[in-house]
Amino acid sequence: MWAVNSGSIYMIGYVPIEAIQQEYRIRVQKMEMAAKDAQRIFMKLKAGEASLPQEVKEKLETAYEKYLSARDWYLTDLSSGFHDPEGFNRTVSVVTWELRKTNAAAQGALKKTPVKQ
């Protein structure tokens, strides 16, 4: 009689699918948190609560656009998504790193606009 361990069936290479799914969730969460930080900065700029030098603002916009592209590519049916974990990990790591770097630069350069009464 055949005994089947269902956990061993769902593997990619030598890595269990659960490990890949967990890594996927963590990377998506980190990328989304970095994007939320950028969104908060954009909200302050739009509300007129703060200002940024043009160069820093352009870098932040570029990093955010890369986030949107990566999100729309990997988190929808446009790509092979979950079936390309190496490509996903590489892309999301770069996008998250760039967002964090530009968020930190923007936070450092953020100038509060005086409140008009």
What are these regions (language model features)?
Residues 1-113:
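Primarily the internal scaffold of c-type cytochrome electron-transfer domains
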